[in-house]
């Protein structure tokens, strides 16, 4: 039975909001008699994998893998996937660096931050999940970038992928921002994303740089897309310690991720329904079809993490002062993924 808990966990000297927590699969063990994982076959003791993700459509592979029981199926009797739903990728980075979770579906910039803060020792990106699916949406009266001067824009959190993207874009347009909300355009990190939508609807902010479905909800509330944000939106990262200790279990996570991606490709309508059902179970409210459809269309779900996009994300974060100069060499470990892709007759990806 799926369990959802609400609470706050103290992590790394700060308060970390946990929006929800559950065990994946049809039982608290997260196991399934219909599958025997490589870890179980090798006689290893059952493992609990603590997995984080966000309640966003850009994290649909995670939502679907939970809803359809793919994690439970692939792990078999090897263990349990215990999921925690976070409000932002920044929170996920804090959790993974403090040992609260073992793996996470996360945006590229939080993954880069985890790599940089740990000196390249904390995490590895083992797969992609989604590209696209984020936009800068503004009120309809704004028709030029110059009109953003003196306005406020929301982002999910300081240093997350959409936060970096809008700051960099504004800098390219000659407008300044600051981490404290100053500058020509005040950037306002707002959690949860739904709060940013409400602030936009009430006129408290001029717009936001938000992932799906929240950018679509802003458009539905009268906004217009000023800029669609391309590139990698979601990757799957694991701690290096967990990968080293449990490579077979990580392989099972990758299988479940591919199961979800294959389902998205083979049955888009069924995949949308599954993702929306899991969103409803997590947030208490499903997305309206008028939001879900457009949100889905702006995302490409793929196992390719797009290394070039990740490098660009790092350079942009450095440019706006949110990241120290960092060497991303070694951040990827795509060998397990490529072995699975090869076995399925699919093209390999590169890091």
Regions found by a protein language model. Give the residues of each.
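Secondary-structure end/capping motifs
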Residues: 246-324
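Bacterial N-terminal signal peptides that target proteins for export
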Residues: 1-11
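Conserved C-terminal helix/tail region of periplasmic/extracytoplasmic solute-binding proteins
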Residues: 315-351
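Short, glycine-/small- and polar/acidic-enriched structural segments
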Residues: 30-188, 206-209, 225-230
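C-terminal motif of bacterial Sec signal peptides marking the signal peptidase cleavage site
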Residues: 15-20
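Pocket-lining segment of extracytoplasmic ligand-binding domains
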Residues: 184, 188, 192-280
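Bacterial signal peptide processing site
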Residues: 22-25
